[in-house]
């Protein structure tokens, strides 16, 4: 993957545009997400480990909001269940193009990997096939809040018995002091990874109208309302967490 450093917000902007997964972001995305999301590499690699426990023969594994395919690559590294295939979906043309390049590179390096189909499209309009694993890795937070339950209901309907949804998201907190503390610690994390105060402030301005995080309680309530029977948090680092939802 690209090692180009993220300098998108390094220079003062007269007007900060809303964040978008365009070609500029795609070029620096691996660096951006590693330096911005605490625990991201751990979540991605272990998502593959978890998926291997739920994958069922002759079923689909979905990577929804696949970006550059990091989760898809983890699924292919860890899942060895017969007849499985991965469907990776993203609505950014730039992301999809680069994702296909990276996955082709993975194919050339390894044998016996799960087949993968990369689709450019809207996951809200996706025709889901019977699935044993669905990964929503930092994707739901970019979907309009009033459309989230319907999407999760459709995912639940597509899941086979014994399957799982693995949902990773940035969190907000209902307790004001807890929210302020973890927000400050997240800023400290970004500073420690080389982001300037200007970069942090401009990125916050760019993303605040685009990304709408929920609390852990809201995620649990929504997942149960969508038909899931059990919600198990398996990872949290500062204000980022990952959950397993069982049908």
Curated annotation (Swiss-Prot):
InterPro entries: CmoA (IPR005271), Methyltransf_25 (IPR041698), SAM-dependent_MTases_sf (IPR029063). GO terms for biological process: tRNA wobble uridine modification. Its EC number is 2.1.3.-. The keyword S-adenosyl-L-methionine applies. One of its GO terms (molecular function) is S-adenosyl-L-methionine binding. Disulfide bonds: none annotated. It catalyses: prephenate + S-adenosyl-L-methionine = carboxy-S-adenosyl-L-methionine + 3-phenylpyruvate + H2O. It comes from the Bacteria. CDD domains: AdoMet_MTases. Keywords: S-adenosyl-L-methionine, Transferase. S-adenosyl-L-methionine binds at residues 40, 65-67, 90-91, 122-123, 137, 204. The keyword Protease does not apply. Catalyzes the conversion of S-adenosyl-L-methionine (SAM) to carboxy-S-adenosyl-L-methionine (Cx-SAM). HAMAP family: Cx_SAM_synthase. Homodimer. Belongs to the class I-like SAM-binding methyltransferase superfamily. Cx-SAM synthase family. This is Carboxy-S-adenosyl-L-methionine synthase. It comes from Pseudomonas fluorescens (strain Pf0-1).
């Amino acid at each position: 993957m690209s090692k180009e450093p993220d300098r998108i917000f390094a220079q003062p902007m007269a007007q900060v545009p809303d964040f978008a997964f365009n070609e500029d972001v795609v070029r620096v995305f691996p660096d951006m997400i590693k330096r911005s999301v605490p625990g991201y590499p751990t979540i991605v690699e272990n998502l593959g480990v978890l998926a291997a426990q739920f994958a069922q023969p002759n079923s689909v594994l979905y990577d929804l909001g696949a970006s550059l395919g990091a989760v898809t690559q983890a699924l292919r590294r860890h899942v060895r269940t017969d007849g499985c295939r991965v469907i990776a979906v993203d609505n950014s043309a730039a992301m999809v193009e680069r994702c296909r390049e990276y996955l082709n590179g993975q194919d050339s390096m390894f044998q016996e990997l799960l087949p993968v189909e990369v689709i450019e499209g809207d996951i809200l309009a996706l025709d889901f096939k019977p699935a044993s694993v669905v990964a929503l890795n930092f994707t739901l937070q970019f979907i309009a809040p009033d459309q989230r339950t319907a999407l999760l209901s459709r995912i639940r309907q597509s899941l086979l018995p014994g399957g799982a949804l693995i949902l990773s998201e940035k969190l907000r907190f209902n307790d004001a002091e807890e929210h302020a503390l973890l927000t400050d610690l997240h800023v400290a994390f970004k500073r420690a990874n080389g982001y300037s105060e200007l970069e942090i402030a401009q990125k916050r301005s760019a993303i605040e109208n685009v990304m709408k995080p929920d609390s852990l309680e809201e995620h649990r309530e929504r997942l149960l309302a969508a038909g899931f029977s059990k919600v198990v948090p398996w990872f949290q680092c500062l204000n980022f967490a990952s959950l397993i939802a069982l049908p």
